[in-house]
């Protein structure tokens, strides 16, 4: 038998009736093929402007999280910027981003896949979006939540590790509804409720042990999820999702357990500059231990983001975490 153990100090918020404690998690696996999979989700990665300048100068804005990222079996983030030299900025948008292709090696070093389902993938139009997909494919970085047509945009990211088959789906819910993939044109996957549910069911039918929707949703600057987010997150779990992960508001939005399954409403920013309010300068990295039964253990690791958009581990911070199918969100001390 193989065993992996984790010691986490917990200190719940005052609303909880118990005091600080140390939780001892042990995960057993009978064979190597059934060992838990460590999966990481990061929030918004914007690799232009300050972060882009860091990379162009030979730096790596993700270096301070290298040990954590390198330890995971698979790493996913929301790519909040097209990577291209072509295209034109969207005339009616206040903020448009475009990263130089020089950022691709750094992205490839730290992440295995990215979601394109967000409101900035189309900042420089279809030309830059197509170039982004080519750069990612050439570098061996998988992408989902966007594609050359509707079918490709809704196609899951498939992860097959240690005998566990995971399907990750990406959707954009930022309004006004724009840059949506169609039957014969490129774009991102829009969060149309019935289509999302159909995609979850299709992934389960195709053999997924676990299905994880990665949503780009919610209101910017709002530190609590909307009723829409809560209602739809719970519906996705009712329809078979193992957990739900979100981003977009540029702030974290807390977590809940629904029917024994975690919902992390927003991870906030991870690599991003240009924000003048403190809530946007702290994000979460979500680390999961998974097997065929679902989520064995999950934790959020806080990142403090500096003026250049570089995240730094916030050692000692207390952030949401949980174990197995327990109906309780704990607060764990970051290492």
Walk through the language-model features, giving the residues of each.
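N-terminal secretory targeting signals
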Residues: 6, 30-34
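Bacterial N-terminal signal peptides
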Residues: 19-28
